[in-house]
Amino acid sequence: MRIKVLTTAIISSLLLTACNDGSSSASSTQTGVLSDSYVKGVAYSAAPSGKTGATGTNGEFDYLAGDTVTFKIGGVTLGSVNMSNTALGLDSGRLMVRPKDLAGVVDETDEKALAVAQFIQTAAAALPSDTRIDVSGNAGKFTTADTVDSLDKVGTLATAAGLSPVSLEKVSQHLLNAPGNVKSVEFTPTDITGLSDANRALAYTTSTVKVAYTDGSTKTFPLSYVNLFNNIDTGKTADGSAAAAIRDKNGHIINDPAGKPYVPQTPDANSLMDVGGTPYLVTHYEYVSKDSAGTDGYGKVPMAMTLAKLSQSKTDGKLAVDSIKPVDFSGVNGLWIPCAGSRSPWNTHLGSEEYEPDARCDASVGDATYAASSSCTGMEYTARMNAFRALYGEATASPYNYGRVPEVTIAMGGASTVQKWYTLGRLSREKVQFFGDSRTAIQGDDGTYTHLTLFVADKARNLSAGTLYAAKWNQLSSDGAEGGKANLTWIKLGHATHGQIKAAVDAGVKFSDLFAVDTSGGATPVAGFTRVKHGHEVATVEDLKLNTGTFAGVPIDTLAAFLETCRYAALKGATVEFEKFEGVAYNARDNKAYAAMTRMANGMENKSVTSTEPANDIRLKKNGSGAVYQLSLQPGWFDSAGTAIDSAFVPVVMEALVVGEDMAADTDGNKSRLDKIASPDNLFFSERMRVLFIGEDSGNHVNNALWAYHVDSGKLVRILSLPMGAESTGLQVVDNLNGHAYIMSNYQHAGDKNSTAQATFDRIKGLINTDKAEVGYLGGLPAMR
């Protein structure tokens, strides 16, 4: 459909030109538009036609069919664009070149695209509200031949020209308010009323998307769920093994006690990336639900990511798998329970390691009493750590090796490398989400009695050093409110380099090197100790005192901040009361972030401060259906000590935006209203669609769903129903990959019982292959540009 529209527009333009000069369409001059709003004064040269000039008031430039056009401001090359590229947008029927096209990337918020936009706007002294900008006044200041390939380069070029770079916050606002081909998008709902058992056993959609274009036309596109591959597929791996088969540090497949390979039923995060013109897909596998005998394997098996090389149909955009191979984690001590993830603005994959092992449970600490307590046995930390070490072949691995951010970089040709970063703290990280400066990120901490952290890297797209902060919730809404609202203040936990923290872990740092623990159990802590409560599935109350001195040359307080982030945050007075803090997302145009809370319970309820409840910052009504929160980002903020936070993207207000609603169980076992979200988990915001996508992980909906929340209208619609008991995972939206958009969506652990009524469960369970889980996407969308 998109190609037909595009072709029609181009043919119409050619026919009009041909009527005017009598020449053939192949040799007729065509007009394109350079758009970051409309950009005047940029020099261009087209080859092979030889056409040259400067862009006009509305960004116009001339070219012939088949030309590649190069754009410059002074001596600085912005990029070159093949005008035959089907991914280019349209402006009133004319092909439109955007900063992402000049940068050779597919995403408007990619760091390279932002760098090109920042340079253009700096040269034009642009304001976010400007609809036309002019670089001609400053073009002569850029006399040296150079290119724009990074944000750092923009700073260097601007300084040399005597200009101040436009802030990235303003760059994003201006860039995303600039003209695009798509004016608005609206999804229609998938109605599950009276849905057949057969359709409740699969990924099911009847939704459409109505796209309104800037030329006044509208098109409606039906959605369909497209399977890329299953976890158990054997046809695309080099050795014929299952796609998700688990391997040890030597690359050998790990077998269960029955001699059959461990194959997880839990595909999670996806990062669909364009690398040198080839699409690749990184996929997480979170945990092994069960082995071949049905024995629970959660957390006791090393986990995996795969890298799939894809091909894309040039006609309908359909993706297909060429090959699948494992990502090698042997150089970083293996991979522990990877949950959600994100594609970084610099086109790498940023993963997670959820439910990090409690280092106080480890035998090296020598705290047998604690190791035998429910804080350790409730999550089986000791059993999991020992099983992981044995199966992966990392006998001496420290608990502090896990709970990290693994970054996967894909090179041209498909080779992958992994770096685990120790600078973003150690927590039950659901997902790390970077903002427009490629330095600032927020992180959700999944579990009960958890916290919200902010990371600010020293340098853009470089995670080797940075500062970590934890949030304090200062409630504005009344006690017992539904969802609630609060101002956020930020407590600095510390600054560190990756090398510092990793060296201490390699040197054998233990929990007891960081903290003293008083176990006398009095109603109040003894002098010098602070009572804190933190946890995952099991909340732990501890009386802690930070040790003094250094370990491996690193101050103990710094190590505590980056090795025991949640404990240390609680010790410093941050709010450690959030409940199942899940996915996060970023809206660049509005400078907002979003965060999912599976439920508001336990620490988030209004409660009395007692010996077992040391804090009551969050005082909300209990809600088992959860909510999505909106966080307003601001520049010029200070931490709790009065020191400036070096970021223009600091969350300062947090309030409930989309809230679920509990109900009495219906005949199927649904315990949350079916027209509202239940237990939100995965989040992703599409800049061009202006839609926040919400994936569920709920026992309160028999069939979890993927929802589309239209942020401008507030309309919420279900666009995908998942198999009974399955969790919606792998959520990522790519607005434009070579002329097509994709909503990546997987599901895991289909057939789980949860709250499903027994009769309903018995009817549907037999229709589901519980060993199978799908990696796929919602297809049928045109490019959103």
Which stretches of residues belong to each language-model region?
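Conserved small-residue
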Residues: 184-785
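Generic hydrophobic, helix-prone segments enriched in Leu/Val/Ile
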Residues: 10-12, 113-134, 148, 305, ...
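Short amphipathic alpha-helical segments, especially helix-boundary/capping motifs
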Residues: 13, 126-155, 379-383, 406-407, ...
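N-terminal hydrophobic or amphipathic segments with adjacent small-residue motifs
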Residues: 3-6, 12, 53, 328, ...
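Feature for extracytoplasmic/surface-facing segments of secreted or surface-associated proteins
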Residues: 24-186
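Bacterial Sec-dependent N-terminal signal peptides
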Residues: 2, 8-32, 59
